[in-house]
Swiss-Prot record:
Top-level division of the source organism's lineage: Bacteria
Enzymatic reactions: S-(5-deoxy-D-ribos-5-yl)-L-homocysteine = (S)-4,5-dihydroxypentane-2,3-dione + L-homocysteine
Cross-referenced NCBIfam families: PRK02260.1-4, PRK02260.2-4
UniProt GO cellular component terms: cytosol
Listed EC numbers: 4.4.1.21
Recorded coiled-coil stretches: none
Class of the enzyme per the UniProt entry, highest EC level: lyase
Annotated residues for binding of Fe cation: H57, H61, C125
Pfam families: LuxS
Keyword tags: Autoinducer synthesis, Iron, Lyase, Metal-binding, Quorum sensing
Originating species: Deinococcus radiodurans (strain ATCC 13939 / DSM 20539 / JCM 16871 / CCUG 27074 / LMG 4051 / NBRC 15346 / NCIMB 9279 / VKM B-1422 / R1)
PANTHER family: S-RIBOSYLHOMOCYSTEINE LYASE
CC cofactor note: Binds 1 Fe cation per subunit.
Protein name, as recorded: S-ribosylhomocysteine lyase
């Protein structure tokens, strides 16, 4: 069996990072020379909790729009499988401070969101019944109350 490709997040020492934070997880260059940056938008300390599936699903729907409102070039905002945060792909290489400010603004929008959740119908969503706006808003408030920071990448010592 061939070796599996290296996955950046498996090299991160999850015991040494301090959530909540924004972290540049990597930059890829496309064959045409464009840069795509991946950011780790961490809500919870790894291995010390997880966001409920309905809440993280709602965060995904809200941050998909709100991050685009505050940061140019957002390609995608998706939940981490561990449910402690989101990954965001963005065209170019925005600086971490700018991403942090955009994330903070998007979290403020999320915390104050008092309208229907966007994209929540059988036509628009693959699991449209699984949402929790109140919990999503609370997670946004919790991160804002704790304060965001830029987290450096701390690699495992192997």
């Amino acid at each position: 069996m061939p070796d599996m490709a290296n996955v950046e997040s498996f090299d991160l020492d999850h015991t040494k990072v301090k959530a909540p934070y924004v972290r540049l997880a990597g930059v890829k260059t496309t064959p045409k020379g464009d840069q795509i940056s991946k950011y780790d938008l961490r809500f919870l300390q790894p291995n010390q909790g997880a966001i409920d599936p309905a809440a993280i699903h709602t965060l995904e729907h809200l941050l998909a729009g709100y991050m685009r409102d505050h940061l140019e070039g957002v390609v995608d905002v998706s939940p981490m499988g561990c449910r402690t945060g989101m990954y965001m792909a963005v065209i170019g290489e925005p600086d971490e401070q700018g991403v942090m400010k955009a994330f903070e603004a998007a979290l403020k929008d999320t915390a104050g969101h008092d309208q229907p959740i966007p994209g929540v119908s059988e036509l628009e969503c693959g699991n449209y019944r699984d949402h929790d706006l109140a919990a999503a808003r609370q997670h946004a408030r919790d991160v804002l109350d704790q304060g965001l920071k830029v987290q450096e990448t701390i690699l495992l010592e192997r």
